[in-house]
Amino acid sequence: MSSFSLLELLAPHLHYFKNLPFADILLTIAVTLFSHWLLNPSYESLVCHLPFVNNRKWYEIGYFKAKSRFLANGAALINSGFEKGDVFRMVMDNGVIMVLHPKFANEIRTIEGLSFSESLAEDFHAQIPGFDPFTSEKLIHDVIKTKLTKKLEHIVKPLSEDTLVALDEWLVGFQANRDWTTFPLRKHILELVARLTSKTLLGSVIGRDPAWRNIMVNYTVDAFVAAYILRLFPKFMRPFAFRFIPQCRKLRKELDEARRIIDPVLEAREKQNVPLDMLPNAPVQDAFSWLEQCANGRVYDPVIAQLSLSVVAIHTTSDMLTQVLFDLVERPELISALRREIVHIFGNDWIDLTRGSLQQLKLMDSVLKESQRMKPVNIGTMICVSNHWMWDPAIYENPEKFDPYRFYKKPGTMSYDFASKFVSPSPEHLGFGLGRHVCPGRFFAATEIKIILCHILLRYEIQLPPASKPKVMKVGAALSADLDAKVLLKRRWQEVVLR
């Protein structure tokens, strides 16, 4: 990837400043640069005895250039850091980060003093209005771990049924057409995952509301842009600067819209004397009930809590599923092998999906884990353990090659063990984190992805347009599925009908 400047990165958003007087723009930039350079000693003081990678040059004012270098070539900079030692610090887009070799993963996996949620709250300015869903809150972790994961067996069938309905509506006018049709994959997968997730968490009324789904899809993206712009200001200026940044105002507007949608549902429940903390065996369970049960008297904001669940559930899952489909369309023989596995597991008849049957899709599980190995979701923040072991030839044979059978049978054995499963993390495969810092929603994500994959592979032929090859987008240490790549879909006869 060629080098680019911070100005180029933010170019799409500069039109927000077009109505400001030129003198005001210059003054704002000058004050920001000077204060950022003069009043941000934390960059220099953080564990100063460690090797420093990508520090600012002596002639650079502030850390804008250093951050731009990281965004343009983050992976190479991290690799250069490990040439200096197993622990080093470097300037990333969100400040100075201590980077650890993956051999330390087991040592820090249980350290209570480290918190991903708190680093997320710091990164995304959770104390500033508009960024409230990024607040460090154990309640969300408890809901995912003790409610959502434990209810998966009961969620699978309705999730499968909703997938069928969503696919039919998504491809309306296409069902009877046997010709190839072009689709922008990432956009449609994001909308599909948002729809299914919102229905699971919030039920039919809100879950099928297009306005709510738009908020779920847009809020996270808008928050990333707003958070990045706000990081350009030193901390002492952020509580004032956010009031004048258009992207921050947009976040507050989206939160107001979320309240407009959710508050009437809460009021209706109250009028109907339906308590939020419905009994665990009640016929209807949703995230409102789970939040109230897990809160156990703690004060929380139901609207912010619902958006917090959406932030952690939608974009990472849709990015993962998009990348898996891109990996598959480049390997038609693998699509055929997966279809054979699905038919073998489910038979040749109408059949209901269950969590147990999904767990028998071991080749699909291996494909998911290999896709994640090649393009993990993230590397963490503040203090992070590098995940470069995921591409280490000393650990994985031909690590640069996509091998869908890599985790299907453990090397040297004829068995498939727990460590090979998609949801099982290890220091050698940090796609979901590790230990107490592991992603609690990985079981729901794996279930949702497998259900969608089963239906898409059975119902549609899928391939790339001629001379097309999706690229993994690299910005800093983050890897993302191609945002613009398209696929061709065509309706096919399906060997088994899943419900």
In which residue ranges do the predicted regions lie?
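N-terminal membrane-proximal hinge/A-helix region immediately C-terminal to the signal-anchor transmembrane segment
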Residues: S2-I140
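Cytochrome P450 heme-thiolate monooxygenase catalytic core
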Residues: K157-L321
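Conserved cytochrome P450 K-helix/beta-meander segment immediately N-terminal to the heme-binding cysteine loop
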Residues: C384-A419
